[in-house]
């Protein structure tokens, strides 16, 4: 005979009317949850994919850093004020008066820089293992787009402290937009919110940094993982005597794969924490539009473009060359590569 609902069950039933969940219903929910997980992780994985040297854990590291940035970013929003008169002072207040405020800012800053490096190395790893060929071409485009989102997330966040270094670095970068043919001046004014870097620029960058770009990340990342799953998982390099379809013995994803991912995540989090305790995020003097530092430098991840300005006309350094590089990056998996047996064996051996 079924037991009558207890006090707490009656409260829940009053809020969510309907039949209380039976064991059969709960089993259905468990199956649904497991089905959703299978979109990103299979029940079993080839044992060879667990080798540390195959991926170096770079994809998982990138995911951990993204969520670490989202978490610390939400905490920073409670203190930061995106107006020129208070932005710099709010950072000082965060570092001096808020409990663990300096540490949280340090973690956010160094995680953002680490994410660029990790994402770039992940892109290189995919390239050198040939993991961008059929049926993974479009996933290469998605991954490249994610890397661009990471770059622009760092770029938009660079201005927010409103110190001299950030202000003039952004002034240099946005000033170069005017050399883009046709839409350069319009694009520059759109991003700056006016003819020069000022309060509207800070407001625009804050909105892009805290709302638009995180939304792109949260949409593209699951899609990226789902495409990996649909393509059959990781590419396993094979020797000349092995069939490319031979994936070897399999092991359960839980716990074999899950434990390795947890270990990588914990080591990464510990490393970021220790680094953030030892090294503070930079903060210069308050931004002064009338006093330009010498030399004025772009953020380190855009210094290559700034260096090209010394050797090429701005149109080529800021528009033509970067555009050609971007087109080449996105078109890379769609090139009709030679598929001879010798080429295939060579690629698999070097992969």
Kindly give the residue locations of the regions a language model identified:
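Specific lipid-exposed transmembrane alpha-helices and their immediate membrane-water interface residues
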Residues: 156-160, 221-233, 266-297, 318-337
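Transmembrane-helix bundle segments that line or gate the permeation/cavity pathway
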Residues: 13-31, 77-83, 110-133, 138-141, ...
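Conserved small/polar residues in nucleotide/adenosyl-binding loops
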Residues: 342-349
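Membrane-entry segments of alpha-helical transmembrane domains in multi-pass membrane proteins
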Residues: 29, 50-68, 95-117, 134-138, ...
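Cytosolic juxtamembrane amphipathic/interface segments immediately preceding
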Residues: 22-23, 37-57, 128, 195-201, ...
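Juxtamembrane inter-helical linkers in multi-pass membrane proteins
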Residues: 90-95, 169-170, 174-185, 232-253, ...
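Central hydrophobic cores of alpha-helical transmembrane segments in multi-pass inner-membrane proteins
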Residues: 33-45, 70, 114-128, 325-334
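Long, contiguous internal "core" modules enriched in hydrophobic/ aromatic residues
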Residues: 204-212, 219-283, 340-342
């Amino acid at each position: 005979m079924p037991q009558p609902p207890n006090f707490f069950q009656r409260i829940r039933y009053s809020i969510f009317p309907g039949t209380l969940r039976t064991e059969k219903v709960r089993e259905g929910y468990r199956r649904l949850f497991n089905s959703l997980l299978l979109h990103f992780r299979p029940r079993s994985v080839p044992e060879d994919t667990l080798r540390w040297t195959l991926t170096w854990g770079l994809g998982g590291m990138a995911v951990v850093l993204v969520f670490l940035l989202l978490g610390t970013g939400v905490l920073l929003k409670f203190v930061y004020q995106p107006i020129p008169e208070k932005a710099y002072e709010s950072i000082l207040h965060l570092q001096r008066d808020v409990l663990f405020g300096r540490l949280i800012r340090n973690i956010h800053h160094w995680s953002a820089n680490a994410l660029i490096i990790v994402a770039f190395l992940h892109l290189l790893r995919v390239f050198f293992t040939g993991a961008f060929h059929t049926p993974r071409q479009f996933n290469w485009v998605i991954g490249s787009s994610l890397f661009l989102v990471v770059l622009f997330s760092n770029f938009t966040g660079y201005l927010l402290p409103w110190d001299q270094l950030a202000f003039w670095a952004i002034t240099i970068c946005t000033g170069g937009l005017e050399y883009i043919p046709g839409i350069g001046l319009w694009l520059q004014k759109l991003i700056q919110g006016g003819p020069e870097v000022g309060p509207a620029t800070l407001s625009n960058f804050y909105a892009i940094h805290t709302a638009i770009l995180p939304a792109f990340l949260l949409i593209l990342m699951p899609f990226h993982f789902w495409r990996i799953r649909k393509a059959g998982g990781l590419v396993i390099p094979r020797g000349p005597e092995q069939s490319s379809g031979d994936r070897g013995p399999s092991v359960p994803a839980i716990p074999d794969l899950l434990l390795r991912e947890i270990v990588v995540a914990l080591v990464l989090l510990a490393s970021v924490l220790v680094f953030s305790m030892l090294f503070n995020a930079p903060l210069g003097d308050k931004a002064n539009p009338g006093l330009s530092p010498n030399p004025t430098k772009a953020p380190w991840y855009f210094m290559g473009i700034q260096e090209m300005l010394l050797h090429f006309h701005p149109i080529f350094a800021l528009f033509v060359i970067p555009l050609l590089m971007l087109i080449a990056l996105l078109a890379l998996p769609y090139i009709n590569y030679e598929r001879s047996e010798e080429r295939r064996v060579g690629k698999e051996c070097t992969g």
